[in-house]
């Protein structure tokens, strides 16, 4: 992420915070729809990401193209358009992120959106037929969205369904699981949390998982555990928190031992 984008992103997130309760699920749906329009228009994408373009002109363009959307969504799109971004994809990232954050900010505290997103990502990865159906470039995006709704409506929160539907409608080169992980990270960040992905050969007992969470939280702050079972690591565990990886898996230790013996 370039420095310009990093600063623009921070200001955009701050603008969202300034809206308070005005930003909600409806705002997110409008932002997602706007993001798809921007993604489909080379000209619009180029103008909105052009640092040399007149800022007031961009604002007029946003209101002309997206004026029918809710006022909070139009305001946030205006903020994004007025910022300086490192590239066109960063504009799309920002629109999607503010949509996801709008959902997270307005969701009831009883709804665990990251857990539901990550659980669905795991289900997709473990079902080759489902993964193919959702990642196929030949499949109609609206059919993918309908499939997501059939699978999740009534089983997951409406907020989770909305985010997942957006990700399959506009994958932008990401795998379903990759997109869901990033969305879960954004939701957690909106709530002031970090996600720690813990890979073990067998499921961790609840008490052990809580001790691990508390231990990691002492160093990394408030966090949520994303538990992944992968028998191929043989034993031990591998923990990833952002860019930090703590690999204590048996498979990793065996690999290092083989390298030492070969040397």
Curated annotation (Swiss-Prot):
Localization (cell): Cell membrane
GO-annotated molecular function: proton-transporting ATP synthase activity, rotational mechanism
InterPro entries membership: ATPase_OSCP/d_CS, ATPase_OSCP/dsu
Record GO cellular component, one term: proton-transporting ATP synthase complex
UniProt membrane topology term: Peripheral membrane protein
Chief place where the protein resides: membrane
UniProt keyword terms in alphabetical order: ATP synthesis, Cell membrane, CF(1), Hydrogen ion transport, Ion transport, Membrane, Transport
Pfam families membership: OSCP
Annotated family: Belongs to the ATPase delta chain family.
Subunit details: F-type ATPases have 2 components, F(1) - the catalytic core - and F(0) - the membrane proton channel. F(1) has five subunits: alpha(3), beta(3), gamma(1), delta(1), epsilon(1). F(0) has three main subunits: a(1), b(2) and c(10-14). The alpha and beta chains form an alternating ring which encloses part of the gamma chain. F(1) is attached to F(0) by a central stalk formed by the gamma and epsilon chains, while a peripheral stalk is formed by the delta and b chains.
Role of this protein: F(1)F(0) ATP synthase produces ATP from ADP in the presence of a proton or sodium gradient. F-type ATPases consist of two structural domains, F(1) containing the extramembraneous catalytic core and F(0) containing the membrane proton channel, linked together by a central stalk and a peripheral stalk. During catalysis, ATP synthesis in the catalytic domain of F(1) is coupled via a rotary mechanism of the central stalk subunits to proton translocation.
Record-linked NCBIfam families: PRK13430.1
Protein name as annotated: ATP synthase subunit delta
Native source organism of the sequence: Leifsonia xyli subsp. xyli (strain CTCB07)
Taxonomic placement: Bacteria, Bacillati, Actinomycetota, Actinomycetes, Micrococcales
Gene expressing this chain: atpH
């Amino acid at each position: 992420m370039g420095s310009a984008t990093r600063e623009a992103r921070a200001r955009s997130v701050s603008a969202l915070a300034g809206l308070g309760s005005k930003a909600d699920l409806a705002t997110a749906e409008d932002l997602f729809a706007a993001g798809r329009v921007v993604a489909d228009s080379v000209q619009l994408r180029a103008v909105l990401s052009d640092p040399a373009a007149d800022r007031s002109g961009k604002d007029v363009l946003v209101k002309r193209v997206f004026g029918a959307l809710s006022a909070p969504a139009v305001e946030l799109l205006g903020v994004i358009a007025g910022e300086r971004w490192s590239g066109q994809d960063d504009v799309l990232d920002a629109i999607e992120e503010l949509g996801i954050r709008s959902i997270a900010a307005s969701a009831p505290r009883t709804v665990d959106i990251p857990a539901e997103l990550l659980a669905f990502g795991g289900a997709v990865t473990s079902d080759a037929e489902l993964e193919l159906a959702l990642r196929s470039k030949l499949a109609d995006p609206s059919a993918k969205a309908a499939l997501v709704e059939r699978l999740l409506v009534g089983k997951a929160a409406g907020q989770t369904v909305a985010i997942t539907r957006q990700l399959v409608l506009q994958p932008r080169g990401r795998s379903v699981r990759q997109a869901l992980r990033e969305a879960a990270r954004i939701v957690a960040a909106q709530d002031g949390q970090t996600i720690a992905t813990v890979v073990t050969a067998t499921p961790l007992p609840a008490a052990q998982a809580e001790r691990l969470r508390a231990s990691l939280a002492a160093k990394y702050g408030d966090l949520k555990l994303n538990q992944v079972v992968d028998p191929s690591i043989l034993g031990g565990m591998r923990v990833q928190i952002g860019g930090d990886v703590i690999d204590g898996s048996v498979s990793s230790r065996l690999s290092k031992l083989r390298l030492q013996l070969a040397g």
